[in-house]
Regions:
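Early extracytoplasmic/lumenal segment of secretory-pathway proteins
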Residues: 23-93
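A ligand-binding cleft/hinge motif common to bilobed small-molecule-binding domains
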Residues: 89-93, 218, 223-242
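Short, low-complexity disordered leader/linker segments with a strong preference
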Residues: 1-30
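An extracytoplasmic/periplasmic, membrane-proximal ligand-sensing/linker region
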Residues: 189-191, 293-332
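Periplasmic-binding protein-like
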Residues: 131, 161-168, 195-200, 206-207, 240-263, 277-300
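A bilobed periplasmic-binding-protein/Venus flytrap-type ligand-binding module shared by bacterial periplasmic
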Residues: 136-141, 255-270, 286-289
Length: 332
Protein backbone atom coordinates (compact mmCIF):
# COMPACT_ATOMS: atom_id res chain seq x y z
CA UNK A 1 0.00 0.00 0.00
CA UNK A 2 2.01 3.08 0.93
CA UNK A 3 5.55 4.31 1.54
CA UNK A 4 7.25 5.05 4.86
CA UNK A 5 6.70 8.65 5.89
CA UNK A 6 8.96 8.66 8.96
CA UNK A 7 5.99 9.93 10.96
CA UNK A 8 4.65 8.54 14.20
CA UNK A 9 1.13 9.47 15.13
CA UNK A 10 0.34 9.26 18.81
CA UNK A 11 -3.14 9.43 20.24
CA UNK A 12 -3.12 11.09 23.64
CA UNK A 13 -5.92 11.91 26.04
CA UNK A 14 -5.25 15.61 25.47
CA UNK A 15 -5.15 15.27 21.70
CA UNK A 16 -2.83 14.15 18.90
CA UNK A 17 0.93 14.72 19.03
CA UNK A 18 4.06 13.55 17.22
CA UNK A 19 6.47 11.26 19.03
CA UNK A 20 9.73 9.58 18.15
CA UNK A 21 10.07 5.86 17.48
CA UNK A 22 10.68 3.67 20.48
CA UNK A 23 9.86 0.28 21.93
CA UNK A 24 6.38 0.15 23.41
CA UNK A 25 7.48 -1.02 26.85
CA UNK A 26 4.69 0.82 28.68
CA UNK A 27 1.71 -1.46 29.22
CA UNK A 28 -0.62 1.34 28.12
CA UNK A 29 1.24 1.92 24.84
CA UNK A 30 0.23 0.10 21.66
CA UNK A 31 2.45 0.47 18.60
CA UNK A 32 0.93 -0.30 15.20
CA UNK A 33 2.84 -0.72 11.93
CA UNK A 34 0.78 -0.19 8.80
CA UNK A 35 0.98 0.49 5.09
CA UNK A 36 -2.60 1.70 4.79
CA UNK A 37 -3.75 4.99 3.26
CA UNK A 38 -3.86 8.39 4.95
CA UNK A 39 -7.65 8.50 5.14
CA UNK A 40 -7.76 5.10 6.85
CA UNK A 41 -5.09 6.18 9.31
CA UNK A 42 -7.05 9.35 10.09
CA UNK A 43 -10.17 7.29 10.78
CA UNK A 44 -8.23 4.80 12.89
CA UNK A 45 -6.66 7.58 14.96
CA UNK A 46 -10.09 9.05 15.62
CA UNK A 47 -11.75 5.76 16.51
CA UNK A 48 -8.94 4.43 18.70
CA UNK A 49 -8.55 7.79 20.43
CA UNK A 50 -12.24 7.82 21.34
CA UNK A 51 -12.35 4.15 22.35
CA UNK A 52 -9.11 4.10 24.35
CA UNK A 53 -8.50 7.59 25.80
CA UNK A 54 -6.11 6.25 28.44
CA UNK A 55 -3.89 4.37 25.99
CA UNK A 56 -1.10 5.82 23.92
CA UNK A 57 -1.55 4.50 20.38
CA UNK A 58 1.49 4.95 18.15
CA UNK A 59 0.96 4.44 14.41
CA UNK A 60 4.05 4.10 12.24
CA UNK A 61 3.76 4.00 8.46
CA UNK A 62 5.95 1.70 6.39
CA UNK A 63 5.64 -0.20 3.13
CA UNK A 64 4.33 -3.77 3.29
CA UNK A 65 7.77 -5.20 2.57
CA UNK A 66 9.46 -3.02 5.20
CA UNK A 67 6.98 -4.10 7.86
CA UNK A 68 7.61 -7.77 7.17
CA UNK A 69 11.38 -7.38 7.05
CA UNK A 70 11.55 -5.41 10.30
CA UNK A 71 9.22 -7.65 12.29
CA UNK A 72 11.00 -10.78 11.06
CA UNK A 73 14.38 -9.32 12.01
CA UNK A 74 13.33 -8.06 15.44
CA UNK A 75 10.76 -10.66 16.47
CA UNK A 76 9.38 -10.28 19.98
CA UNK A 77 11.81 -7.43 20.68
CA UNK A 78 10.16 -5.30 17.99
CA UNK A 79 8.60 -2.00 18.92
CA UNK A 80 5.59 -3.16 16.93
CA UNK A 81 2.66 -4.72 18.77
CA UNK A 82 0.09 -4.98 15.97
CA UNK A 83 0.61 -5.26 12.23
CA UNK A 84 -2.37 -3.53 10.59
CA UNK A 85 -3.53 -4.05 6.99
CA UNK A 86 -0.54 -6.13 5.92
CA UNK A 87 -0.64 -8.04 2.63
CA UNK A 88 -1.36 -11.75 3.11
CA UNK A 89 1.79 -12.94 1.34
CA UNK A 90 3.97 -11.05 3.80
CA UNK A 91 1.83 -12.26 6.71
CA UNK A 92 2.46 -15.83 5.55
CA UNK A 93 6.17 -15.08 5.59
CA UNK A 94 5.99 -13.73 9.14
CA UNK A 95 4.01 -16.79 10.24
CA UNK A 96 6.65 -19.04 8.73
CA UNK A 97 9.35 -17.18 10.65
CA UNK A 98 7.47 -17.58 13.94
CA UNK A 99 7.18 -13.87 14.74
CA UNK A 100 3.39 -13.62 15.19
CA UNK A 101 1.22 -14.62 18.14
CA UNK A 102 -1.47 -17.21 17.54
CA UNK A 103 -5.06 -15.96 17.83
CA UNK A 104 -6.56 -19.44 17.44
CA UNK A 105 -9.88 -19.59 19.27
CA UNK A 106 -9.85 -15.90 20.19
CA UNK A 107 -12.18 -14.70 17.42
CA UNK A 108 -15.19 -15.93 15.46
CA UNK A 109 -13.68 -16.30 12.00
CA UNK A 110 -16.98 -17.63 10.65
CA UNK A 111 -18.06 -13.97 10.40
CA UNK A 112 -15.57 -13.53 7.57
CA UNK A 113 -15.90 -14.71 3.98
CA UNK A 114 -14.27 -18.09 3.45
CA UNK A 115 -11.58 -16.89 1.04
CA UNK A 116 -10.34 -14.35 3.60
CA UNK A 117 -9.42 -17.04 6.15
CA UNK A 118 -7.32 -19.55 4.23
CA UNK A 119 -5.61 -22.29 6.21
CA UNK A 120 -2.23 -20.63 5.63
CA UNK A 121 -3.10 -17.66 7.87
CA UNK A 122 -6.27 -18.40 9.83
CA UNK A 123 -4.58 -19.11 13.17
CA UNK A 124 -2.75 -15.77 13.15
CA UNK A 125 -4.59 -13.20 11.01
CA UNK A 126 -7.82 -11.23 11.19
CA UNK A 127 -9.04 -10.17 7.73
CA UNK A 128 -9.20 -6.43 7.26
CA UNK A 129 -9.35 -5.18 3.66
CA UNK A 130 -10.05 -6.58 0.22
CA UNK A 131 -8.34 -4.22 -2.20
CA UNK A 132 -9.01 -4.35 -5.93
CA UNK A 133 -6.92 -2.61 -8.54
CA UNK A 134 -7.78 -0.75 -11.69
CA UNK A 135 -6.17 1.22 -14.47
CA UNK A 136 -6.60 4.75 -13.19
CA UNK A 137 -6.37 7.61 -15.68
CA UNK A 138 -6.08 11.37 -15.41
CA UNK A 139 -8.41 12.58 -18.15
CA UNK A 140 -6.87 16.05 -18.27
CA UNK A 141 -3.33 14.77 -18.75
CA UNK A 142 -4.54 12.46 -21.52
CA UNK A 143 -6.34 15.34 -23.19
CA UNK A 144 -3.37 17.68 -22.87
CA UNK A 145 -1.15 15.04 -24.49
CA UNK A 146 -3.66 14.32 -27.25
CA UNK A 147 -4.18 10.75 -26.05
CA UNK A 148 -7.38 8.71 -25.96
CA UNK A 149 -8.36 6.42 -23.10
CA UNK A 150 -6.44 3.13 -23.24
CA UNK A 151 -8.61 0.06 -23.73
CA UNK A 152 -6.03 -2.67 -23.13
CA UNK A 153 -2.70 -3.32 -21.45
CA UNK A 154 -1.08 -3.44 -24.87
CA UNK A 155 -2.23 0.12 -25.61
CA UNK A 156 0.13 1.27 -22.87
CA UNK A 157 3.15 -0.02 -24.78
CA UNK A 158 2.80 2.72 -27.39
CA UNK A 159 5.65 5.24 -27.31
CA UNK A 160 3.12 8.06 -26.87
CA UNK A 161 2.88 6.95 -23.23
CA UNK A 162 6.62 7.37 -22.62
CA UNK A 163 7.08 8.51 -19.02
CA UNK A 164 3.32 8.77 -18.49
CA UNK A 165 2.68 5.48 -16.66
CA UNK A 166 3.15 4.79 -12.95
CA UNK A 167 3.12 1.47 -11.13
CA UNK A 168 4.26 0.31 -7.71
CA UNK A 169 7.19 -2.09 -7.62
CA UNK A 170 6.01 -5.67 -7.04
CA UNK A 171 9.05 -6.17 -4.81
CA UNK A 172 8.01 -3.53 -2.29
CA UNK A 173 4.25 -3.22 -2.72
CA UNK A 174 1.39 -5.68 -2.55
CA UNK A 175 -0.46 -3.45 -4.99
CA UNK A 176 2.28 -3.71 -7.58
CA UNK A 177 2.55 -7.44 -7.07
CA UNK A 178 -1.16 -8.08 -7.60
CA UNK A 179 -0.99 -6.53 -11.08
CA UNK A 180 2.01 -8.68 -11.97
CA UNK A 181 0.42 -11.85 -10.62
CA UNK A 182 -2.92 -11.23 -12.34
CA UNK A 183 -1.21 -11.01 -15.73
CA UNK A 184 0.83 -14.13 -15.02
CA UNK A 185 -2.46 -15.94 -14.43
CA UNK A 186 -4.03 -14.44 -17.55
CA UNK A 187 -1.13 -14.80 -20.00
CA UNK A 188 1.45 -17.10 -18.45
CA UNK A 189 4.65 -16.14 -16.69
CA UNK A 190 6.87 -15.65 -19.75
CA UNK A 191 4.43 -13.36 -21.55
CA UNK A 192 3.63 -11.35 -18.42
CA UNK A 193 7.28 -10.72 -17.56
CA UNK A 194 7.98 -9.83 -21.20
CA UNK A 195 5.10 -7.35 -21.09
CA UNK A 196 6.62 -5.47 -18.17
CA UNK A 197 10.00 -5.46 -19.91
CA UNK A 198 8.27 -3.70 -22.81
CA UNK A 199 6.25 -1.40 -20.55
CA UNK A 200 9.19 -0.21 -18.44
CA UNK A 201 10.39 2.51 -20.88
CA UNK A 202 6.95 4.13 -20.50
CA UNK A 203 6.99 3.92 -16.68
CA UNK A 204 7.98 7.17 -15.00
CA UNK A 205 8.93 5.21 -11.89
CA UNK A 206 8.18 1.96 -10.14
CA UNK A 207 7.16 3.46 -6.82
CA UNK A 208 7.89 1.94 -3.42
CA UNK A 209 4.32 2.56 -2.39
CA UNK A 210 1.06 1.25 -3.76
CA UNK A 211 -0.33 4.74 -3.22
CA UNK A 212 2.35 6.23 -5.46
CA UNK A 213 0.58 5.81 -8.82
CA UNK A 214 -2.63 7.54 -7.73
CA UNK A 215 -0.65 10.31 -6.06
CA UNK A 216 1.28 10.82 -9.30
CA UNK A 217 -2.02 11.01 -11.18
CA UNK A 218 -3.39 13.61 -8.77
CA UNK A 219 -0.20 15.66 -9.24
CA UNK A 220 -0.57 15.34 -13.05
CA UNK A 221 2.85 13.72 -13.29
CA UNK A 222 1.46 10.78 -15.28
CA UNK A 223 -1.61 9.95 -17.34
CA UNK A 224 -2.07 6.31 -16.31
CA UNK A 225 -1.55 4.50 -13.02
CA UNK A 226 -1.82 0.88 -11.98
CA UNK A 227 -3.59 1.76 -8.74
CA UNK A 228 -6.01 0.88 -5.98
CA UNK A 229 -9.69 1.41 -6.72
CA UNK A 230 -10.40 2.57 -3.16
CA UNK A 231 -7.71 5.24 -3.25
CA UNK A 232 -8.85 6.58 -6.62
CA UNK A 233 -12.46 6.70 -5.42
CA UNK A 234 -11.41 8.58 -2.29
CA UNK A 235 -9.72 11.21 -4.47
CA UNK A 236 -12.80 11.43 -6.70
CA UNK A 237 -15.09 11.80 -3.69
CA UNK A 238 -12.78 14.51 -2.36
CA UNK A 239 -13.50 16.58 -5.47
CA UNK A 240 -10.95 15.42 -8.05
CA UNK A 241 -12.98 15.06 -11.26
CA UNK A 242 -9.93 14.33 -13.42
CA UNK A 243 -9.58 10.70 -12.36
CA UNK A 244 -11.43 7.71 -13.79
CA UNK A 245 -11.15 3.99 -13.05
CA UNK A 246 -10.89 1.63 -16.04
CA UNK A 247 -10.83 -2.15 -16.24
CA UNK A 248 -9.33 -4.29 -18.99
CA UNK A 249 -10.52 -7.70 -20.13
CA UNK A 250 -8.09 -9.55 -17.83
CA UNK A 251 -10.13 -8.32 -14.87
CA UNK A 252 -9.28 -6.37 -11.74
CA UNK A 253 -6.39 -7.74 -9.67
CA UNK A 254 -7.14 -8.12 -6.00
CA UNK A 255 -5.27 -8.49 -2.72
CA UNK A 256 -6.26 -9.28 0.83
CA UNK A 257 -4.83 -7.44 3.83
CA UNK A 258 -5.07 -8.43 7.47
CA UNK A 259 -4.14 -7.66 11.07
CA UNK A 260 -1.87 -9.69 13.35
CA UNK A 261 -0.21 -9.47 16.76
CA UNK A 262 3.58 -9.65 17.01
CA UNK A 263 5.01 -12.58 18.98
CA UNK A 264 4.79 -12.11 22.73
CA UNK A 265 2.61 -8.99 22.58
CA UNK A 266 -0.83 -10.56 23.05
CA UNK A 267 -0.13 -10.82 26.78
CA UNK A 268 -0.38 -7.03 27.03
CA UNK A 269 -3.96 -6.16 27.94
CA UNK A 270 -3.91 -2.98 25.88
CA UNK A 271 -2.75 -4.82 22.76
CA UNK A 272 -5.44 -7.49 23.07
CA UNK A 273 -8.14 -4.90 23.67
CA UNK A 274 -7.12 -2.92 20.59
CA UNK A 275 -7.07 -6.10 18.47
CA UNK A 276 -10.52 -7.03 19.81
CA UNK A 277 -11.82 -3.60 18.81
CA UNK A 278 -10.39 -3.90 15.31
CA UNK A 279 -12.29 -7.18 14.95
CA UNK A 280 -15.57 -6.17 16.59
CA UNK A 281 -15.96 -2.67 15.15
CA UNK A 282 -13.21 -1.11 13.10
CA UNK A 283 -12.97 -3.49 10.14
CA UNK A 284 -16.68 -3.08 9.42
CA UNK A 285 -16.49 0.69 9.89
CA UNK A 286 -13.54 1.24 7.54
CA UNK A 287 -15.04 -1.14 4.97
CA UNK A 288 -18.33 0.75 5.14
CA UNK A 289 -16.65 4.09 4.54
CA UNK A 290 -13.75 3.28 2.21
CA UNK A 291 -13.33 -0.39 1.29
CA UNK A 292 -16.67 -1.86 0.15
CA UNK A 293 -15.11 -4.96 -1.42
CA UNK A 294 -16.28 -7.36 1.30
CA UNK A 295 -14.32 -9.36 3.83
CA UNK A 296 -17.25 -9.81 6.24
CA UNK A 297 -20.29 -11.94 5.47
CA UNK A 298 -23.74 -10.40 5.07
CA UNK A 299 -22.48 -6.92 4.23
CA UNK A 300 -23.48 -4.66 1.37
CA UNK A 301 -21.67 -1.35 1.48
CA UNK A 302 -22.43 1.60 -0.78
CA UNK A 303 -19.51 3.98 -1.30
CA UNK A 304 -20.19 6.84 -3.71
CA UNK A 305 -18.51 6.48 -7.12
CA UNK A 306 -17.20 3.01 -6.30
CA UNK A 307 -17.46 0.78 -9.40
CA UNK A 308 -20.17 -1.87 -9.27
CA UNK A 309 -20.12 -5.46 -10.49
CA UNK A 310 -16.33 -5.58 -10.69
CA UNK A 311 -15.03 -8.56 -12.63
CA UNK A 312 -11.97 -9.73 -10.74
CA UNK A 313 -8.91 -11.33 -12.27
CA UNK A 314 -8.02 -14.93 -11.52
CA UNK A 315 -5.85 -14.73 -8.40
CA UNK A 316 -5.92 -18.41 -7.45
CA UNK A 317 -2.65 -19.84 -6.19
CA UNK A 318 -1.49 -16.47 -4.90
CA UNK A 319 0.54 -17.72 -1.95
CA UNK A 320 3.95 -17.06 -0.44
CA UNK A 321 5.79 -19.70 -2.47
CA UNK A 322 4.37 -18.40 -5.74
CA UNK A 323 5.19 -14.83 -4.76
CA UNK A 324 8.80 -15.49 -3.85
CA UNK A 325 9.39 -17.52 -7.01
CA UNK A 326 7.88 -14.83 -9.24
CA UNK A 327 9.63 -11.90 -7.57
CA UNK A 328 12.97 -13.64 -8.03
CA UNK A 329 12.42 -13.13 -11.76
CA UNK A 330 11.42 -9.45 -11.53
CA UNK A 331 14.31 -7.28 -12.71
CA UNK A 332 12.98 -3.71 -12.67
Amino acid sequence: MKITKSLLFTLLLAGTAFVSTGCSKNNNTVTIYTSTEDYNIALMKKCLGEQFPNYKIVIEEKSTSEIAAQVIEEGSSSACDIVFAEEYGYLEKMIGQGVLDSIKGDYDLSRYLDDTVPASVNEYVLPNIRCGGGIIINKKVLEDRGLTKPTSYNDLLDSSYRGLVSMASPKSSGTGYMFLYSLVKAWGETEALSYFDSLTPNVLAYTTSGSGPVNALVNREVAVGFGMISQAVDKINSGNNELEVLFFEEGAPCNLYGNAIVKGKKAKTAVKEVMDYLDSFYTNESNRLYYPEPVLKNTNYNVANFPENIQYADMTGNNLAAKEALLAKWTH
